[in-house]
Amino acid sequence: MFVDYEFYKETFKGKLSEEEFDKFVNLSCMKITKETCSRVTDGTLNNFPNELILDIKTCVCALIDKLKIFQDAIDTASNFKQEKIVKSQTAGAVSVTYDTSFSSYFLDSKNQEIQIKSIINACLCPRCINGKFYNLLSKVIENSNSCKTCSLV
């Protein structure tokens, strides 16, 4: 686990309860490990500079909040079966339309994946830190220690 509840509440200023946090933290960490081709794991986290560790932890927290939104959409959709929200009604030939726009947007798995990747890309974009280039999202595994951009500065 890359982040604890204290970091989530105090540094990230997250709003979820500890129980809700625990529900989503491991999945968030697994998504980052997958997207970084296992460059970021429990065993490698402390090998990065503090600035990058902070970004990784922030990314986990942002994913936790997003996964909670997805879960709320699933819960809302299942509640529609019991408590349907009427969007429109027609009396002649009886036609009823239910509002599912909010939940359908968040239930779309492609949309979920796009949102998750967007968060990861924003938090873990390639950068130079202290003259070393870090590209955690590259699909090419290479050990380039120097940064051409940093050496120009």
Spans of features found by a protein language model:
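Divalent metal-cofactor coordination and adjacent catalytic microenvironments
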Residues: 1-153
